[in-house]
């Protein structure tokens, strides 16, 4: 069944798609047919069938959506990877620069698509916090704020902040090759925000915007870009 084409986002928009990886089981065979040879090989490396099916569904859905923007069949979308592993699309029309980023946590998947600037997205299932995690993720200032929070708030604030940081690092294309404290936030800020520091510099932080997502119950999310004046358009 054909799907209608999509108008690409403007320079002031980030399109955000969200879906349940476990609710697309009926499309598994169709999604598998869309994958590249490299993606098939990676799918075969998963130890557990649930994880393999989620990977196939996520990549198939990614190809479906990008294909609608590019007016291409899903299997014709050409994906390559930057030096730090961030994927990008190589067969775009002349003058186009659609950027995207995909994230998933358990069964929750989210895709950000932007027009002309790099974007990062992250979703995190809210789960128990291991004792070492705040030390690994927070700067010293953030840890002071975190430790002062009521215990009832710590879990949600931790994963909200983690999602912001990872979205920023993914926008840079590095992931956790850079330390999480490369992005520092004021933990009293909720919803849309900007970093307090990026790489220790307040001036660099002024170029960034981070938008909050609500991916679902017990789940935190964020979209980040080194770009001002943009807004999130929910696509589903």
What are these regions (language model features)?
Residues 1-236:
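Core catalytic alpha/beta fold that binds nucleotide/phospho-ligands
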């Amino acid at each position: 069944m054909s799907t209608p084409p999509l108008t690409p986002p403007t320079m002031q928009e980030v399109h955000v798609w969200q879906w349940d990886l476990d609710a697309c089981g009926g499309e598994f065979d169709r999604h598998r047919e869309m994958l590249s040879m490299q993606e098939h090989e990676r799918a075969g490396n998963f130890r557990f069938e649930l994880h393999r099916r989620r990977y196939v569904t996520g990549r198939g859905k990614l190809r479906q959506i990008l294909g609608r923007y590019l007016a291409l069949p899903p299997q014709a979308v050409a994906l390559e990877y930057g030096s730090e592993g961030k994927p990008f699309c190589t067969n775009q029309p002349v003058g186009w620069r659609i950027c995207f980023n995909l994230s998933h946590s358990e069964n929750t998947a989210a895709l950000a698509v932007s027009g002309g600037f790099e974007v990062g997205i992250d979703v995190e299932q809210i789960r128990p916090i291991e004792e070492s995690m705040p030390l690994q993720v927070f700067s010293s200032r953030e840890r002071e704020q975190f430790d002062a929070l009521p215990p009832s708030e710590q879990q949600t604030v931790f994963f909200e902040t983690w999602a912001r940081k990872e979205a920023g690092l993914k926008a840079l294309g590095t992931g956790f090759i850079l330390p999480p404290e490369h992005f520092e936030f004021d933990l009293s800020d909720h919803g849309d925000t900007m970093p307090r520091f990026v790489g220790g510099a307040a001036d660099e932080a002024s170029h960034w915007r981070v938008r909050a997502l609500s991916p679902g119950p017990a789940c935190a999310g964020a979209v980040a870009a080194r770009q001002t004046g943009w807004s999130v358009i929910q696509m589903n």
